[in-house]
Amino acid sequence: MQKTRFDELVDFPCHFTFKVMGVASDSLPDQVVEVLQEHAPGDYSPSVKPSSKGNYHSISVAVRVESQQHIEILYRSLSDIEDVRYVL
């Protein structure tokens, strides 16, 4: 893992909000929470917003992260969900 300026700007542990965008499905929020529970157990209440045409959902959830590496693991794991298109 490369040391970046990001390391200087963020004090860990902290809460980090992930925004996951994917194909609209009733199971997507549960899949996101399942991945989060695997890597960062906690009580999550994701916020779900549908796109204007209803084809996609944007899911926002705050997660307590321990390090930059922890954030990167979560990004990769969330991106691996089949219906996910973007993770911000």
Swiss-Prot record:
Transmembrane segments: none annotated. InterPro entries: UPF0250_YbeD-like, YbeD-like_sf. One of its GO terms (cellular component) is cytosol. PANTHER family: UPF0250 PROTEIN YBED. Belongs to the UPF0250 family. This is UPF0250 protein IL0958.
